[in-house]
């Protein structure tokens, strides 16, 4: 049994590594007929679209068959979550299989739209057949990446996390190397390098602690003895961060894709407007996924059905209203911190000059830490039976 459990872990990790290898290979397979125009390459260089793409498994810097990545999937996930959370259009009547089909259909439609926008962006020379083939190949490549992530969810570790983590590292490692080279040209270079390393370590420590931080909601359980009938329901202060970055980044790519059809002086291409829009969207998406993770209405109903209650708060609607207010308050620090880090990572380079590359480091560090933490937690869960077998053997 012990060998069987350990073998299962090795198989899952190996399958995830196999998925990553396929993804990396696809990033280096060029898209046929694609010729990046000067306008497109300048847009990639002067806008944060390449950064935005990396956080959803896309790669707009290198035009390949996997350039779109998981970007459309993030859009469809948000739409499904909105329909589910708001109970709109009779969504509750759908079976899980129907929801899955709807999500796949939405992903396909969004994939085709994004593929068309990308094709029209990186080439000015129009050829109907070539454009169609490029859109078809980009769509097929994105669908393959999505399918690989679904397979990884079943047979591997981390679902889409290994693909997105690889995409982030693909951009983060060259950025860090170039920043280190820049620091080495400065006076007291080793002091600056040490300061950068300490800053990164402190940042990792802070975000690990903040991710685990929670508000202890006290709930009375009448079935327990009166002396110890208070239970603690942990409300995470940063429970929506990962979804905010993944989904938010995917959404923010759309205005940048559409922006090329407007003049450079238009509002949509103004970086101050883009930064403000990103901040607002970041906060809204953070709050949305916080409410998705902890739905006050469903929690109030669950408390009432299990005969739990919050001290001095009546069950039912009063509890729901109390939880609503509580979530708005306790999620505020996480919403502001993550939105600030998002905006600074995307647009901090506009006022850092020669040191623009340092702006993205904090956001990269946070996302790498979160994804690696999520993968580690899943591996620990898979390893639990193996550790349990060893414990029985020792006894």
Curated annotation (Swiss-Prot):
Cellular location(s): Cell membrane
Entry-linked SUPFAM superfamilies: Preprotein translocase SecY subunit
One Gene Ontology term from the biological process aspect of the record: intracellular protein transmembrane transport
Residue intervals passing through the bilayer: 13-33, 63-83, 102-122, 128-148, 157-177, 190-210, 239-259, 272-292, 326-346, 355-375
Keywords tagged on the record: Cell membrane, Membrane, Protein transport, Translocation, Transmembrane, Transmembrane helix, Transport
UniProt main location, coarse: membrane
Membrane topology annotation: Multi-pass membrane protein
InterPro entries membership: SecY/SEC61-alpha, SecY2, SecY_dom_sf
Cellular component, GO annotation: plasma membrane
Gene3D superfamilies with a match to the protein in the record: SecY subunit domain
HAMAP family hit by this protein: SecY2
Quaternary organization: Component of the accessory SecA2/SecY2 protein translocase complex required to export cell wall proteins. May form heterotrimers with SecE and SecG subunits.
Stated family: Belongs to the SecY/SEC61-alpha family. SecY2 subfamily.
Protein task: Part of the accessory SecA2/SecY2 system specifically required for export of possible cell wall proteins. The central subunit of a protein translocation channel.
Protein name: Accessory Sec system protein translocase subunit SecY2
Organism, as annotated: Lactobacillus johnsonii (strain CNCM I-12250 / La1 / NCC 533)
């Amino acid at each position: 049994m012990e060998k069987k459990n350990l073998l299962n872990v090795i198989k899952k990790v190996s399958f995830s590594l196999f998925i990553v290898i396929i993804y990396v290979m696809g990033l280096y397979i060029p898209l046929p007929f694609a010729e990046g125009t000067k306008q497109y390459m300048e847009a990639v260089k002067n806008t944060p679209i390449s950064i935005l793409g990396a956080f959803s498994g896309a790669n707009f810097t290198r035009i390949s068959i996997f350039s779109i990545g998981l970007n459309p999937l993030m859009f469809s996930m948000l739409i499904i979550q909105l329909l589910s959370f708001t109970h709109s259009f009779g969504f509750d009547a759908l079976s899980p299989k129907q929801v899955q089909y709807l999500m796949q259909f939405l992903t396909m439609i969004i994939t085709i739209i994004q593929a068309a926008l990308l094709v029209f962006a990186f080439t000015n020379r129009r050829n109907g057949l070539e454009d169609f083939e490029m859109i078809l190949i980009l769509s097929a490549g994105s669908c393959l990446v999505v399918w690989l992530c679904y397979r990884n969810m079943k047979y591997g570790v981390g679902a889409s996390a290994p693909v997105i983590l690889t995409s982030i590292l693909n951009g983060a490692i060259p950025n860090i190397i170039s920043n280190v080279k820049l620091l080495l040209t400065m006076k007291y270079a080793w002091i600056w390098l040490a300061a950068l390393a300490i800053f990164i370590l402190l940042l990792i420590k802070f975000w690990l602690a903040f991710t685990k931080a929670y508000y202890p909601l006290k709930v009375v359980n009448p079935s327990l003895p009166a002396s110890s009938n208070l239970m603690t329901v942990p409300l995470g202060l940063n429970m929506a961060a990962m979804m905010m970055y993944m989904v938010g980044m995917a959404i923010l790519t759309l205005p940048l894709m559409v922006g090329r059809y407007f003049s450079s002086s238009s509002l949509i291409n103004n970086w101050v407007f883009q930064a403000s829009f990103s901040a607002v969207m970041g906060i809204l998406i953070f709050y949305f996924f916080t409410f998705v993770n902890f739905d006050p209405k469903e929690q109030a109903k669950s408390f009432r059905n299990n005969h739990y209650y919050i001290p001095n708060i009546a069950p039912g609607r009063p509890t729901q209203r109390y939880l609503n207010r509580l979530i708005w308050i306790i999620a505020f620090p996480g919403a502001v911190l993550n939105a600030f880090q998002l905006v600074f990572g995307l647009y901090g380079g506009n006022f850092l000059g020669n040191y623009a590359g340092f702006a993205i480091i904090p956001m990269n560090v946070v996302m790498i830490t979160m994804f690696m933490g999520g993968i580690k937690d899943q591996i620990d869960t898979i390893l639990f039976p193996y550790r349990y077998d060893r414990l029985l053997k020792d006894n």
